[in-house]
Amino acid sequence: MTERLAIVGLGGSLARTSRSLAALRVALDGAAEAGATTTLLDLRELDLHMYNPDHEGEPPPAATRLMEACYGANGMLWSSPMYQGTISGAFKNALDWLHALGSREPPFLHDQVIGLISAAGGSQGLQAINTMEFAVRALRGWAVPYVVPVASAYRVFDSEGRLTDESVELQLRTLGAEVVRVATRFADDSTAQRARACEESAELVAAAG
């Protein structure tokens, strides 16, 4: 490919200092180092209204910005704190707004490659990752198998949200690069066609079952 891929990072929290946002920034750096152009959608800065299906026709400006950035991307990186065993309400609200993309062709985040990150106070960050994987499938995307659940996040970020653990930094940069690598393959028409064939086969199997 000659054009640089566009990777959008979505996440963070509503807190002034967000560990999940700091993790997302590092992963986006990894994507940029792999040759992609990157855009950050910080949930605190976006300040989205609560999703309302009645407003899909005329969404608020922040929701429009979110939807257009996500729909135009080749791939994404998602990052959420883990609250009560799952993703944050703010992150889920952002995903709810993406429901409005269902009327487009192709719909939702069709064939987009998505890398997943969570930041947890304990060791159960995979629970938030699992929730995100369900959402990726619902939005017709493809989650890369490599995920980064940052456990005991308070230990690997300082009080200003700066990452202090080299091992976690490497994992996050690797995830960013992996999203670019897989998205590059999907950008090849023949690869995308094979991916769609796999998706159609999976739908047929599900219908038969």
Mark where each language-model region is.
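N-terminal beta1-alpha1 ligand-phosphate binding loop
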Residues: 2-36
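Glycine-rich phosphate/pyrophosphate-binding loop and the adjoining helix
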Residues: 2-3, 8, 142-209
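N-terminal beta-loop-helix "entrance" segment that forms/cooperates
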Residues: 43-60, 156-160
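Helix-loop-strand module that forms the ligand-binding subsite of alpha/beta enzymes
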Residues: 58-139
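Generic secondary-structure signature for well-ordered alpha-helical cores
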Residues: 29-36, 100-103, 137, 141, ...
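Cofactor-binding loop segments of dinucleotide-utilizing enzymes, especially the Rossmann-like FAD-
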Residues: 12, 43, 119-121
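Short beta-strand elements in bilobed, periplasmic/extracellular small-molecule ligand-binding domains
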Residues: 35-50, 143-151
